[in-house]
Amino acid sequence: MARQLYDYWFVQFDFPNEEGKPYKSSVGKMVYNPILKREIPEGWEMKKLGELCYFSNGINYDKTIEGDTNYKIVNVRNISSSSMLIDSEDLDSICLPSKQAKNYLIEKNAILIARSGVPGATRIVEDVLDCIYCGFIIKCLPHNQLLRLYLTFLLKQFEGTTLTQTGGSILKNVSQETLKSICIVVPSEEILKTFDTQIQTIIDTMNLHINQIASLTKQRDELLPLLMNGQVNFDLSDD
């Protein structure tokens, strides 16, 4: 549903106009952009990701160095095993010097992009404190928090592909420079606010379901050995 909404609003440009009608289908004004080589809604801008976001590579650490603080860490496998939201229950823990690790903490509005595995695979992490990311991942931190979910869906279009500066499909080697050079359409602030509100509701529901599944899985794993050993019985007889 979230993906469909993104496509409808930002690929087909049928976001709601002032009357609540689909913009492009209702003959909303489109303007040709020579760099993108296509029409975009009037009033929308074209910018490079480097103008909109701060990028940084993840941590490379020495396992032989003694740490003083425990952190959750997002590895490439966490990205590969998820589709959009990273399962916080599946994250590894690592003890590192806080002086080093504090530079790699994942902020609330950050986007994570894999450099290996599935190149360009894009994910987000919700509500995880003291969480860092590994060196095979790039963090994208939008200057405007309203861009986070929009950019997440935009970047997910290019997973496992290579990328031209105008967003064409020709990221085998994902780097900060590659990402910074991508030219994208920037919607109006009003449309971004509406999209962010609607998608965040869906994300919150997805995150709730992930946590519920993790809780049920934990209960199953705890009960199964007890059932197999006969330490727990279920009375299925009728009263």
Placement of each model-derived feature along the sequence:
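Glycine-rich, mobile lid/loop segments that gate access to catalytic sites or pores
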Residues: 2, 6-13, 19-27
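Sequence-specific dsDNA recognition surfaces
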Residues: 32-35, 50-64, 77-108, 127
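A short beta-sheet element
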Residues: 75-76, 92-159, 165-168, 175
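Flexible loop/turn segments at secondary-structure boundaries
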Residues: 81-83, 120-122, 234
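Hydrophobic/basic alpha-helical segments
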Residues: 148, 157, 197, 201-204
